[in-house]
Amino acid sequence: MATCWPEPIVSVQSLSQTGVPTVPNRYVKPAHQRPVFNTTQSDAGIEIPVLDMNDVWGKPEGLRLVRSACEEWGFFQMVNHGVTHSLMERVRGAWREFFELPLEEKRKYANSPDTYEGYGSRLGVVKDAKLDWSDYFFLNYLPSSIRNPSKWPSQPPKIRELIEKYGEEVRKLCERLTETLSESLGLKPNKLMQALGGGDKVGASLRTNFYPKCPQPQLTLGLSSHSDPGGITILLPDEKVAGLQVRRGDGWVTIKSVPNALIVNIGDQLQILSNGIYKSVEHQVIVNSGMERVSLAFFYNPRSDIPVGPIEELVTANRPALYKPIRFDEYRSLIRQKGPCGKNQVDSLLLTR
């Protein structure tokens, strides 16, 4: 894996703050990749499902709702999820404060492509690639043995404490959600967790995304189209500014976040484990000229050093294994080299292409 970026890193936030009237060429996407701000689906009021987890946990009908959302969309919003609302607001606010710090303070945590940990502004190491209009901060969270304390920001005050508290609440949510997803697939509650490597062996990471104002939002993206490489993603969205779009057929649906909701999406590893019953779905982020956005993505992933393939009970004569097994660390390394690229990586594992 590369240990340095192919070109000098430029903070997109700093670039935006200079008041540039146009988007520099390195951020201008090819015409077919540029954002769509109004789609037929959005105009028709089509939105991803919203699940009240009080109606889901431990209830047969709840399992059917989860399965329907995962099969039809690969995305859903959840309310009454158990994560403290005030904690959600405080950790989001702390990260917003971090990104308002002077650039020299943020650069103390500058990242490199070997681990991605820390403060950065690009994904992938392909030279001369078209870049996204965003900055981010990436942290390893689980297992705790791989955390790098030197990469955890010390400013603003209490941000480390908030990261720890938020991470712990979302970890518990992921464990419960993994049981529910397992049952929704017709498996024993603990089967999916076992396939991920076991509760104390799973991986997790946190990426905070910062999307600055953009002078020409129609020419670029905050995050290019991709599916998430891991197991499950729990997103704490910016409630004030929309931007996340989910692919629906040939178009895109802009998610309208519900107050105090978290957004769940299926990752590539769960698509593989479910033998294609549940599918990771392409999504992207659009930017705007008037407001900045902050969101927090918590990635719940398989243990990195075990092969991940279709769960045995989900392989039948009528539905043979669709994917080649692959270790998550190998899969993630390929993603990190290429950067966001639709669903090309998971599709490359299909046994009958």
From Swiss-Prot:
Knockout-associated phenotype: The quadruple mutant jox1, jox2, jox3 and jox4 exhibit reduced root and shoot growth, delayed flowering, reduced seed production, constitutively elevated jasmonate and jasmonoyl-L-isoleucine levels, and enhanced resistance to the necrotrophic fungal pathogen Botrytis cinerea and the herbivorous caterpillar Mamestra brassicae.
Binding site for 2-oxoglutarate: 209, 211, 293, 295
Keyword list, A-Z: Dioxygenase, Iron, Jasmonic acid signaling pathway, Metal-binding, Oxidoreductase, Plant defense
Residues reported to bind Fe cation: 226, 228, 283
Cellular component per GO, a single term: cytosol
E.C. no: 1.14.11.-
Swiss-Prot/TrEMBL catalytic activity: jasmonate + 2-oxoglutarate + O2 = (1R,2R)-12-hydroxyjasmonate + succinate + CO2
Induction: Induced by infection with the bacterial pathogen Pseudomonas syringae pv. tomato. Induced by wounding. Induced by infection with the fungal pathogen Botrytis cinerea. Induced by methyl jasmonate (MeJA). Induced by infestation with the caterpillar Mamestra brassicae. Induced by salt stress. Down-regulated by UV-B.
GO molecular function: dioxygenase activity; iron ion binding; jasmonic acid hydrolase
Superkingdom of this protein's organism: Eukaryota
UniProt-listed InterPro entries: DIOX_N, IPNS-like_FE2OG_OXY, IPNS-like_sf, Oxoglu/Fe-dep_dioxygenase_dom, Plant_2OG-oxidoreductases
Entry's cofactor comment: Binds 1 Fe(2+) ion per subunit.
Protein name: Jasmonate-induced oxygenase 4
